[in-house]
Amino acid sequence: MSPISQKGEAVCLSVRVQPRSSKSGVAGMYGEQLKICLKSAPVDNAANKECCELLAKALGVPRSSVSVMKGASSRSKVLKVEGVTPAAVREALVGMLGDEAEAGA
């Protein structure tokens, strides 16, 4: 199963976040989810905001195009990305993660 799915016009991305990391970035796969490390603490929505900003930058879309669909208070989240195709998301992930993303995608 892939962490990428399509729901209507948007792409859904299943992620697992690790707040309070030493550095922010996409860390690889966590089972069937994309693992994202965040410097922010999960307080006052800071980690969710950082997660959306990080993915928006990685996918080349505006920050407003990325939102948390499910799991706002959980480490496991489903993010909705508008203005991009599943193939473009997959390509961006492969560019960031190499072979590990291809295995999960």
UniProtKB/Swiss-Prot annotation:
Transmembrane feature ranges: none
Domain of life of the source: Bacteria
Entry's Gene Ontology cellular component terms: cytoplasm
Coiled-coil intervals: none
Family membership: Belongs to the UPF0235 family.
NCBIfam families associated with the record: DUF167 family protein
Protein name (database record): UPF0235 protein CT1832
